[in-house]
Amino acid sequence: MKQSVKKPPPPGDTTVRGELPNGKLEEAPPPVLPPPPRPMADKDTSNESSSGSATQNTKERPPTELSTTEATTPATPAPPLQPRTLNPASKWSKIQIVTKQTGNECVTAIEIVPATPAGMRPAANV
């Protein structure tokens, strides 16, 4: 009488449907790959701020358009605007943001506005 010797299936072989643990065929989940590195073109190399210009003169700029959801549902009502008063003992300086174009490059600089005596200052720029 000849005995049949059962060979174990090779590892990872799912085509053999012999004895299965717990009666279920288990499949390994797909491996999780790390995200690909960012291309160099997307990298921020400039010193620009995402907040934009912080100038006080808003009369020269056209009003920005709000999306329909922002225009119909205001978050909180804005308090009435009051003129600012400057403290003469303050160490802060007034600045101006200037952008100049040379060729195909733009250069943005912050210039310190020279201090003027309080009597010489126009009221609209305070």
Swiss-Prot record:
Lineage summary: Eukaryota, Metazoa, Chordata, Craniata, Vertebrata
Disordered as annotated region, ranges: 1-90
Biased composition (Pro residues): 28-39
Membrane topology field: Multi-pass membrane protein
Chain intervals with Low complexity compositional bias: 64-75
Compositionally biased spans, kind Polar residues: 47-57
UniProt entry keywords in alphabetical sequence: Cell membrane, G-protein coupled receptor, Membrane, Postsynaptic cell membrane, Receptor, Synapse, Transducer, Transmembrane
Residues exposed to the Cytoplasmic side: 1-126
Main location: membrane
Name of the molecule in the record: Muscarinic acetylcholine receptor M4
Biological role stated in the UniProt entry: The muscarinic acetylcholine receptor mediates various cellular responses, including inhibition of adenylate cyclase, breakdown of phosphoinositides and modulation of potassium channels through the action of G proteins. Primary transducing effect is inhibition of adenylate cyclase. May couple to multiple functional responses in cell lines.
MF annotations from Gene Ontology: G protein-coupled receptor activity
UniProt keyword annotation of Isomerase present: no
Localization in the cell: Cell membrane; Postsynaptic cell membrane
Family designation: Belongs to the G-protein coupled receptor 1 family. Muscarinic acetylcholine receptor subfamily. CHRM4 sub-subfamily.
Source species, domain of life: Eukaryota
Keyword Cell membrane: yes
GO cellular component terms attached to this protein's record: postsynaptic membrane
